[in-house]
Design a protein with these regions (language model features):
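SAM-dependent methyltransferases
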Residues: 1-25
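Compact, glycine-rich, soluble single-domain proteins
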Residues: 27-76, 84
Length: 109
């Protein structure tokens, strides 16, 4: 016999739960690396999402919303970077940003 719970609603933990933190490693494939134009495209993509996104390389971490920060990473062709996102749309942000990087920032070189 199961206990009668009446009209007591199930607890809602969504407001107290922390948003997920996800990360993904990707490699810069384009000839000129993460230069100004590529960094600008990356920032514009990152700004579409609510999640906080960081880019890490060689122990240095910068905001995905900072063109100068991204360029200061010095990520040339073949550089491995880690994308780290925290927020409710973290997976979508990582998917979109990784696709942008892996496509060579849509550059023709």
């Amino acid at each position: 016999m199961t206990p009668d719970t009446g009209d007591i609603p199930a607890p809602d933990y969504s407001s107290s739960a922390s948003p997920p933190v996800l990360s993904r490693i990707t490699v810069i494939p384009n000839k000129r690396g993460l230069h100004a134009r590529a960094a600008a495209k990356f920032v514009m993509m990152a700004e579409r999402f609510d999640s906080s996104v960081e880019v890490l390389r060689d122990g240095q971490s910068v905001s995905a919303r900072s063109i100068m920060g991204l360029m200061m990473l010095g990520a040339g062709k073949g550089a491995e970077i880690e994308l780290r996102a925290e927020g409710w749309d973290a997976k979508e942000a990582l998917d979109a940003l990784a696709l942008l990087v892996e496509s060579g920032f849509d550059e023709q070189d």
